[in-house]
């Protein structure tokens, strides 16, 4: 075997050589206006898709080239157990409320939010800044059913204009 061809992959967790398992998906936090949102039960995936633009040159009619086109950032759903925390309702009402268009907040309805992924010790391991978000859907209560015994969930769907990982957040040393 030619040793020069086989190189070791970079460690997945450079600050924690003992660690082999990836992070879990059940410890996370969302910050809206710099404050953590209590009781979140679910955040949908951060997902972007770039359309493909096909391009053919006249001198090469047998194949086409594929170029990146417009990138779309998919909506993000946030869910929390119903409580007396008004953060979802107040944000949704900045876009639309019973007082009509005049009550819409043209200044404050868009917010930059932060999504933090936490390790099992509760330390931030990855952080994403989500830009220019606004609420496009709001569910104050779920379907109510006397034959079920489940937690009532409040939900918002937010539109966004892009997200990026906060490179300043690095892997914390675990104990």
Residue positions per predicted region:
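Glycine-rich, low-complexity intrinsically disordered segments
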Residues: 4-175
């Amino acid at each position: 075997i030619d040793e020069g061809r086989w190189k070791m992959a970079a460690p997945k967790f450079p600050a924690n050589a003992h660690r082999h398992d990836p992070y879990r998906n059940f410890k996370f936090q969302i910050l809206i206006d710099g404050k953590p949102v209590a009781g979140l039960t679910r955040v949908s995936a951060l997902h972007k898709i770039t359309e493909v633009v096909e391009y053919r040159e006249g001198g090469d009619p047998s194949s086409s080239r594929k170029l990146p086109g417009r990138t779309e950032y998919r909506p993000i759903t946030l869910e929390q157990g119903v409580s007396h925390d008004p953060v979802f309702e107040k944000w949704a009402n900045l876009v639309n409320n019973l007082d009509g268009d005049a009550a819409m907040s043209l200044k404050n309805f868009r917010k930059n939010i932060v999504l933090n992924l936490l390790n099992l010790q509760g330390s931030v391991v990855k952080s994403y800044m989500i830009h220019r978000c606004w609420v496009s859907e709001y569910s104050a209560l779920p379907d109510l059913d006397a034959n079920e015994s489940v937690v009532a969930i409040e939900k918002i769907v937010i539109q966004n204009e892009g997200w990026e990982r906060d490179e300043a957040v690095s892997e914390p040393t675990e104990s």
